[in-house]
Each structure stands twice: as structure tokens, then as C-alpha cells.
Amino acid sequence: PDTNTNTESCENTSIDNLQKCDLKHDNLDRYYYIYIPENLDNNSSIPVLFALHGYGSSAYRHFSYTNYIPIADSNNLVIIYPQGATTDTLSSHWNVGGWTSKSTVKDIEFIDTLINFTKNKIMIDETRIYSSGMSNGGYMSYHLACNLGEKFAAIASITGSMTNGTYDDCSPSHPTPVLQIHGLLDYVVPYDGNAGSKSIPDVIDYWVNYNSCSSDPDRLIKYSNDFDLILYDTYINCLN
């Protein structure tokens, strides 16, 4: 039997312009939040940003601390906050293989379904769909670029990485701009990688090579004192 539905049920929340939508996907009850600016200009390009929470977190918590509302309001931007699934072995998560390999949740298809729902009710610019994610959500952003790349223009990963499986099987459909934000002292997703994740330099090298960027970055020291150093590397002359 068909375990997906072609309909969703949305309701307003206590926050202006934020709706919660429920649907069934692959026989699982799933939901997401969608923020649609009150003064959305339907006569101009409407980009969409997927904002993906970290492992064990939630869509609403991610909405609360990312504070994307001012960005959405000033850029005619629709933001979607999907909720990861919970299974018998995993808390709320995104199935990216590797350390989530016990999961059977079809998250790539779930995100694709949300794109279809969104474009059926809003005249979005399908060439300007983006994904950003925190930790496990960052892994998922890379997973989407590798496996649903035809739908995503660019992605961002904050403290995420690529699992070995995502890295080895990555098949992007076009040169893809990537933003990676990471701390050298991150012990949850180590900068130098571990048995289940690629190192951040390996991840950056993959996309630099795939996008045919200059191999040496332009480096800007954004902040420095006796205790901290923030480096901002930009790879230029890329294909996209």
C-alpha cells in the first residue's frame, strides 16, 4: 500500500507567520514548520531555505535559536524547519548513513516531498533552494547536495561533516557553493574526523576539487586575541 499521502494539514502557531504542518511519509507521521513573511512579494523571486536541526534536537528549538526571521523578512525568503524522525535506536535525527546507519528513515525523499508541497502553494524560485544545518543537520545538508543536488543551489554546514558513505558515494548534479563553519576543539564532530566522519579538510578539499576552485584560499583573520582565532577562508574562481 501507498505509505505516503499527497496532502498535508497546516495550522497557525502562536508566532506570527509561522505554521506547523503535519503529513505522513513512508508510513511515519512527520511534520515541519514553515515561516512565510507577512509581506511576501509574490511578484519577485522567492527563495527557500531548509533549516535542519541537530541530533536529538527539534525543529521548533532550531527555529528559536537560529533567529532567521529578520533575514527572511528582509530578503523575501521562505524558511522550512523540518522535524527529524525518532526510531527505536535513535533520537530525532537525519538519516545520513554512517553513524545513523541503523536508521531506515527516507529523509532524502521526505525533504523532496516538502519541496513539492511548498512549490504547490507558493511560487518559489526552484533555482534558489538552499539547505543549512547544525551538526547532524549539517551532515544532512551535505547528504542532500550529494543525493538531491538537482534541487539545491547551495548548502551550509555548521559543525557538521560528511559520513564516509556520503563522501564515497557523493554524486552532485552541478557545482555547488558550500559554507562550512567548524571549531578546532569540537569533540562531538571532530575537526580531524573519526571512524564515522571525514575530516573537515577532507570535506573542503572534496568540494574545492569538485567545484574546480583555486586550491589556495583567500584567508581573512576575522577575529584574534590571546585565546581565540577565527579564520575565514574563501576559495575563488569556482565553476559556480
Where are these regions (language model features)?
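Cap/lid segment of the alpha/beta-hydrolase catalytic domain
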Residues: 83-106
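Alpha/beta-hydrolase active-site loop
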Residues: 100-122, 143
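Alpha/beta-hydrolase fold nucleophile elbow
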Residues: 123-135
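Short, proline-enriched alpha-helix->beta-strand connector loops that line the catalytic pocket
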Residues: 173-178, 238-240
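Short substrate-entry loop that stabilizes the transition state in hydrolases
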Residues: 40-90, 164-165, 188-190
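A domain-start/cap signature at the N-terminus of enzymes
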Residues: 1-48, 63, 74, 103, ...
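Short beta-strand/loop motif that positions the catalytic acidic residue
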Residues: 180-182, 186
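Conserved alpha/beta-hydrolase "acid-adjacent" motif
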Residues: 187-199
